[in-house]
Amino acid sequence: MAFLDNPTIILAHIRQSHVTSDDTGMCEMVLIDHDVDLEKTHPPSVPGDSGSEVQGSSGETQGYIYAQSVDITSSWDFGIRRRSNTAQRLERLRKERQNQIKCKNIQWKERNSKQSAQELKSLFEKKSLKEKPPSSGKQSILSVRLEQCPLQLNNPFNEYSKFDGKGHVGTTATKKIDVYLPLHSSQDRLLPMTVVTMASARVQDLIGLICWQYTSEGREPKLNDNVSAYCLHIAEDDGEVDTDFPPLDSNEPIHKFGFSTLALVEKYSSPGLTSKESLFVRINAAHGFSLIQVDNTKVTMKEILLKAVKRRKGSQKISGPQYRLEKQSEPNIAVDLESTLESQNAWEFCLVRENSSRADGVFEEDSQIDIATVQDMLSSHHYKSFKVSMIHRLRFTTDVQLGISGDKVEIDPVTNQKASTKFWIKQKPISIDCDLLCACDLAEEKSPSHAVFKLTYLSSHDYKHLYFESDAATVSEIVLKVNYILESRASTARADYLAQKQRKLNRRTSFSFQKEKKSGQQ
């Protein structure tokens, strides 16, 4: 047993003892108040009065003044009691009793009295269920749509319906295209079928979407189930297929092309434009002639006249002087435009301006056309590229790609030009419209491996010349192809160039004649 007379040590011991035994915390609060009262009753002593004794006692008790227990701190929740494990267990038992009150216990007892079969039958009496007559109600919209579209479920092109952009207008990038169908009858082919496709679709996907919409609308005749049997061509606003250009590449995205009018054309295995027999009508005009392709002999002469005038004026608006058609063998007799080609019994006509007549000898060209020449002239309008060298003024050359079609001539520099562009000016791309082309002549041919040709065109009211070199076979093919294009197009620039060239030749001839005459007189 220990005897302590220091109240501070005793208070600290009591606090430490109540850490684990006092759950209320009230003793701790009482003891703190007692410390405050103790300080008031024992003020600090005056220095000098038994200073050594006070200093000794204060040195021993300095660490215990207001010493509280280690685990108890003074805060706003100082007097809040933490729940013990016993209280938590009692709370859990209380909740279990409440849940038991909500449950109802029913005791199962065996049935002692036996009931007869009639009593059991009366308990579960069979009900008579009468069959309801079929209701003649209104059909749902879904049933009506399924009856109206019996081919929708059997559409072989359903996989391409996901590229239909009609439900995505305004939310996703789409593209609206008018598609002409040359495989239709003569009446239906005049009206295009509007297709809205996703901008991310490829050309092959667009062909499948066109076939899907064509089949869904129940059009005739039926299409081939293979999408690869069709291709897309550029078409005019009136539905005429532009065969001068190849079909669109099926692997390219459709947003790459800016055409709003296309035509769905069936592919053919044989070379050429189609496997069917091609029919051509020759239209003679001033400074050249044109070959108009027709599908059959049932076409009217009015359609042939419109195509001939459009071919003559090119991209210009069809306005100004009016024209008429005459048979080549019957001058000054206009052809009935409402009649068909079959009733004319002729394949060669002449395009004459109204209120005028054919001059003598203007159209005295040979009417006999070799079929090989016709095929060469038709193929000349198809796009083809050649790799040649362009000759500049200082006689240095630049490798270029020369692309020739029925509408324009494109000159694109080859990208790999490190040697030529290091010291010289880089060649820029050039595009020349065929209406501005004037002539294409062979300049020189030194050997089978080297030849030079000259291309003349109109630029800003002045004639410019471009010189190219390549092997003799390539140069000969290019010159022949360009001349076929020039002969089939009635170009004003070419006519003016030939007239100017003829005037220079006449002036030179007259000058040499006068010079010879003067020398003879002397």
Swiss-Prot record:
One of its GO terms (biological process) is negative regulation of apoptotic process. It is a peripheral membrane protein. Component of the mechanistic target of rapamycin complex 2 (mTORC2), which transduces signals from growth factors to pathways involved in proliferation, cytoskeletal organization, lipogenesis and anabolic output. In response to growth factors, mTORC2 phosphorylates and activates AGC protein kinase family members, including AKT (AKT1, AKT2 and AKT3), PKC (PRKCA, PRKCB and PRKCE) and SGK1. In contrast to mTORC1, mTORC2 is nutrient-insensitive. Residues 2-184 are annotated as: Interaction with MAP3K2. This is Target of rapamycin complex 2 subunit MAPKAP1. Keywords: Acetylation, Cell membrane, Cytoplasm, Endoplasmic reticulum, Endosome, Golgi apparatus, Lysosome, Membrane, Mitochondrion, Mitochondrion outer membrane, Nucleus, Phosphoprotein, Stress response. Belongs to the SIN1 family. The CRIM domain forms a ubiquitin-like fold with a characteristic acidic loop, which recognizes and binds AGC protein kinase family members substrates. Arg-83 is required for the phosphorylation of SGK1, but not AKT (AKT1, AKT2 and AKT3): SGK1 promotes a large conformation change of the N-terminus of MAPKAP1/SIN1, promoting formation of a salt-bridge with RICTOR, leading to SGK1 phosphorylation. GO terms for molecular function: enzyme-substrate adaptor activity; phosphatidic acid binding; phosphatidylinositol-3,4,5-trisphosphate binding; phosphatidylinositol-3,4-bisphosphate binding; phosphatidylinositol-3,5-bisphosphate binding; phosphatidylinositol-4,5-bisphosphate binding; protein kinase binding; small GTPase binding. It comes from Mus musculus. It comes from the Eukaryota. A 1,2-diacyl-sn-glycero-3-phospho-(1D-myo-inositol-3,4,5-trisphosphate) binds at R393, K428, K464. It is found in: Cell membrane; Endoplasmic reticulum membrane; Early endosome membrane; Late endosome membrane. InterPro entries: CRIM_dom (IPR031567), PH-like_dom_sf (IPR011993), Sin1/Avo1 (IPR008828), Sin1_N (IPR032679), Sin1_PH_dom (IPR031313). Residues 38-59 are annotated as: Disordered. Component of the mechanistic target of rapamycin complex 2 (mTORC2), consisting in two heterotretramers composed of MTOR, MLST8, RICTOR and MAPKAP1/SIN1. The mTORC2 core complex associates with PRR5/PROTOR1 and/or PRR5L/PROTOR2. Contrary to mTORC1, mTORC2 does not bind to and is not sensitive to FKBP12-rapamycin. Interacts with MAP3K2. Interacts with ATF2. Interacts with MAPK8. Interacts with GTP-bound HRAS and KRAS; inhibiting their activity. Interacts with IFNAR2.
